[in-house]
Amino acid sequence: MEKKTSCLLCVLTALLLAVLYLWAALRPGVWLRDAFLYRQADGSFSGRDAYAAYTMQIAQTENGAEVEFTLDGETRRYRLESKAEGMSDPGVKIEQDGVVIFTGTALGDPGDAILWREDDGGLADEVNVIVNGEYRRSDLWPSCSWLYHVAVGGRRETRGSVAFLLPIGALVVLLVLDVRFPLLFWNLRHGLEVYGGEPTDWYYAMQRVSRITGTIGVFVLAAMSFAVH
């Protein structure tokens, strides 16, 4: 009876952890470098990283979108026009607080498009990399490409990488089978070779090690799913 109670508690704990993980991993939003901006109930986005706190409001327009982006209390307003009048198709124009900061074209799917400048044919944005925590405040603002992907292209992501769900699920299934049927893998390997044999103490020792390793692997993969994007 005591063993059944312990097993039931373990199962309930595992289910609770699984539900909490899925809830956290599948929360919608969008990545801005290493900051994840969670989608809120009112349609806005907010999040923070080691450098600043961010909020964003997006309003769709007839041929693009308007974005209000706040960084640590400072707000900038962007207007994005796709297929802007007098421009090539698909022409893009982006304004920041009424000043044009980009005109050019978008190549590819809007959610992952490459933006090319009309004047010099170069990419819309410079690549800014924060090294050893050294940065300029201007590096923290969203790039033209990111704004286009999110506001016009409708890019949406989840907090955790869903690519990790398959290996996590596979490990969990193997652990459940090994606990529920302790001799399953031994029988699969030796059942046709040995009749009436028994696993050795070494087998049981390695089985315990594999269970511990598998459990650690599940938590490591779960943690990695939040770090990789």
Where on the chain are the PLM-derived regions?
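Short, flexible coil/linker elements and helix-boundary hinge sites characteristic
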Residues: 27-28, 43, 195-196
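Long, solvent-exposed extracytoplasmic domains/loops
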Residues: 34-154
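Generic detection of intrinsically disordered/low-complexity segments and helix-coil linkers/edges
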Residues: 15-17, 25, 110, 180, ...
